[in-house]
Every structure is written in structure tokens, then in C-alpha cells.
Amino acid sequence: MNLGKRLLVMLAALAIATFFSAKTKTLSRNRIDENGFPRIVLWAWERPEDLSTFDPQRFAVAFLAQTLILKGDDVVLTPRHQPLKVRPEAKLIAVTRIESQKTTGERPALIDLQRQKLVMLIMRTLELKNVSALQIDFDAASSERLFYRSLLQELRQKLPDKVPLSMTALASFCVGDRWLQDLPVDEAVPMIFRMGADDQAIKRFLAHREDFREPLCRRSYGIALDEPFEAKFDTSRRLYLFNNRSWMTSDIAALEERTPR
């Protein structure tokens, strides 16, 4: 085979490899769907919650299981203290909130031992009753992103293959920041509430039927029950709902107005 033909073959092979690589990224797994989670997930934060009246066929529950604070070269654990009541058949996601400089006022060391301790503590939440998925909630400063990426990579490697791994993401990350690309998670839930300075710009962006540029952010939405939002939701995506108080049966009516069946 002469040089010209060999070059054509190599280019064709590269094109095919690129095509299938793109297809693989587009069709990456979503273990949350594979595990049959309902389309609506109620966030249950650190307060007493009685969700036993909510239909587990329609609602899953993502509850705050623990808060982990990166302080210096240590990890400080604060477990959940408030009671959570759900139906026995409810699908549960254990949420770990990770905090650092905004809470402590000092930069964390971000060393390997901290990452390993985080992984160990997060893995333990999988042992809680009826938990079948994990979610990580954090605010990643630019200087912390490599640390969080390595944390998620190690966590995914240690988790059983079928267990979903979810994370929350600032909506601004989903619109114009590519650091989420290729993270080993099943979804990055865009937090479309309490957005501060970005609030109006992002809500206008979505109201004009624009979509998040990051594919991991196109599998779900995160909204608050007490914040008006005019964008039309893609009904194929999962909806995470935050309430600024304990959930009550009367909230179902408000849910019906905000969420598609």
C-alpha cells in the first residue's frame, strides 16, 4: 500500500473513531433512569421531615445525610440530626454536602488524605436504610476543581457499578463553564434558584428556550418551590424540588401547578 492510500486509511479510521467517541459521550449511562427513579425528587434538608403521605411511585427523596467540612488538612463530619419519615418503598438518595473556605474562612489543604476520608465517609451513606443512590453537593472554587474531579473519580471507582452518582451544579457552570465535562457522574443537577447575580440572566436564557451547553446538565432540573420560574421544562428530565420549610401534604397542590405529570 503506497503512502497516499495509507494516509487515507488512517484518516478514515480516525474519523470513525471520532464518530463513535462522540456517540459514546452522547449516550453515556444514566444509572438513575436504569434504577427506575421517579421523575420528581424532593430534597429533604436538615429539618424534621414526614414524607410518608407522598406517593413513592411519583416522588423520590434526596435527603441530607451529612455535611463534611474541609478545614485545614482535616475533614469535619456533621451527621444528620433531624428525623426523616418515608414510606418503606420510597427511593432514597443520600446527599452529602461538602463545605470549605466559605464556611471556615481559610483555604483547605486539599491533600490526598482529605480526599480519601471524604470517599470513605460518603461511601458509608450507602449503608443507610433504603438508600440506592448518592448525590454530592458542593461549591467548587476554581482552585478546588481538580480536587473535586479526583474525588468523584475515586468515588465512582469504589461504588458498585449499578449505584447512581449524582452531583449538584451551579447553573452558571452548565451554561458557559466546561469544567463539568467528562466528570464520572450520571447527572449534574443545575440549581436554578438562589442564583445571586446570575439569576435574571440565566432565567432569561432558559425562558428563550435555550438549553444548558453541558450534556450532564440536560438530564434534570433543580428548582425551589418558593421561586417563580417561567421556563418550559423538558418533561423527559428529572425534576429536583427544594422547599424552604418542611414538606407538608398541602404542598402537593403547589407541586401540581409547577410540575408536569
Positions of PLM-derived features:
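N-terminal Sec-pathway targeting helices
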Residues: M1-L11
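Hydrophobic h-region of N-terminal signal peptides that target proteins for export
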Residues: A12-S21
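Boundary/entry segment of secreted carbohydrate-active catalytic domains
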Residues: A22-R58, A62-L64, L77-R80, A90, ...
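Chitinase-like catalytic core of GlcNAc-active glycosidases
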Residues: N35-P38, K71-V185
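Active-site beta-loop-alpha junctions enriched in small/polar residues
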Residues: W43-R47, Q66, R97-Q101, D139-A141, ...
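Conserved, mostly hydrophobic/aromatic
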Residues: V61, I136, A188
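Substrate-binding surface in catalytic domains of secreted glycosidases
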Residues: R156-A224
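C-terminal active-site rim and adjoining tail of enzyme catalytic domains
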Residues: D198-R261
